[in-house]
Swiss-Prot record:
Residues the entry annotates as binding substrate: 200-202, 239-240, 247-249, 308, 421-424
SUPFAM superfamilies found in the cross-reference section: Phosphofructokinase
Designated gene of the protein: pfp
Pathway annotation from the record: Carbohydrate degradation; glycolysis; D-glyceraldehyde 3-phosphate and glycerone phosphate from D-glucose: step 3/4
HAMAP family the UniProt entry points to: Phosphofructokinase_II_Long
Protein name per its UniProtKB record: Pyrophosphate--fructose 6-phosphate 1-phosphotransferase
Species name: Porphyromonas gingivalis (Bacteroides gingivalis)
Amino acid sequence: MAKSALHLARMSYQPKMPASLQGAVKIIEGKATEAVSDKEEIAAIFPRTYGLPLISFAPGGERTEYPPTNVGVILSGGQAPGGHNVIAGLFDEMKLLNPDSRLFGFLMGPDGLIEHKYRELTAEVIDEYRNTGGFDMIGSGRTKLDKPEQFEAGLEILRELDIKALVIIGGDDSNTNACILAEYYASIDAGIQVIGCPKTIDGDLKNKQIETSFGFDTAAKVYSELIGNIQRDCNSARKYWHFIKLMGRSASHITLECALQTHPNICIVSEEVEANNYYLDDVVTYIAETVVRRSEAGMNFGTVLIPEGLIEFLPAMKRLIKELNEFLSQNDAEFKLIKRSAQRQYIKNKLSPENSRLYDSLPVDVARQLIADRDPHGNVQVSLIATEKLLADMTAQKLAEWAEEGRFQGRFSTLTHFFGYEGRCAMPSNFDANYCYCLGRAASILIAAGKTGYMAAIKNTADPVSEWEAGGVPMTMMMNMERRSGKMKPVIRKALVDMDGEPYRALREMRREWALSTEYVYPGPIQFFGPEHVCDSPTMTLRLEKNDR
């Protein structure tokens, strides 16, 4: 492939590692663990992988002869910067433990395992992708891996290739499936270990043991650069309000982090909206009031950051979406027979009275998007809902009403943006390059230790890399029971913005000042070379959360 000058320079970057991942490693097992909630139900579903101990690595173990081990790897779900470095770290540690070990990448996500499509990942292949963005080394996919017939189809190719361990790199849903697969293979004594690695730019796969998911650092910095560019333009022209929607279907971590980096005039946090039982009109009124106050100070411009999943956090909308999800999952075949022109009336007649009235009141585009095709996990595809345009239009309408009443004499012109794909395959920051490489090395060590049902984990990530701690976390420890597609299922719990956490508190303390003044920060592009405080610094979220731990 053709390479840019920066690409060539990044290929030679050697990721940093803590001492616990260098040389001989000692495995330290902690106490038995239990699920975050619904303990009895989770224990019953995962009898062979429940209650496993936490694992930490320490330097100074005895050098051991390891047999050659063939390993498979899958990239699952949406892309996130750093996935290639997870594979590179996995490969390098495998070869260090035994040069005769082999790594196979299943193509286009779980489908590659099920359909027996793969490629061997040699040093020549992997060296082309070190420190690069994207998942194009082997591709990714969103197929759910949760059925016994899929597990058996995968087992055929695993046995054919003499693969003893499978690494699944993905988000909470993908690692939930990895946990189910680990339990299934253990239940039939298949001799296949399953290890997970935490990936999602949304930042919603984290807990006390998993401090961050890879890709979040890079994506937040990419979006923050773009927001900073827009804010500089905004402060130069001084005639537009920019409504900017950011990735984050289930949580507002990206929006919050970008706000901390760029100081917008308004930052909507979905979790705050839900906690205060706000309605859509409450959010619109808050934005409009800020527009009025800035206009009175001679500032007919500003920026609004909006999380992708806001609609799902509005309590009334949440109830509507829940009923829609359950109804459509149970009546999918019948719904598909309804003409598109008649679908809205059909849905309205099937909903409860309260939800029917709300659904009928929605703009045509939003109502249509709520019943559009679901993702493979049965969820409304909220990224298709143009929340940024909806809020901009509703704010304009409210301001027009206020103007007629004499409450607003300013100007209000809007531009809308959605930053999503721009950050998914960016060249990983130094933080993500280091973090992902360490995750891959940790996954390989867990395999060598004979573990299954674990997720590779790195702690102390707000500190310099030399102080990071590596290990493994039982995936059942993160599980709870949730309703999915109308049924209660075990899933890894998503991490929402903590309303008592330091990152949110920092926003809350500054948001009024940001709203009434113009204190934009312009982060600029990700830096790969130069002083460590410029190139290697973690996110504001990680640094602030360090105070909570």
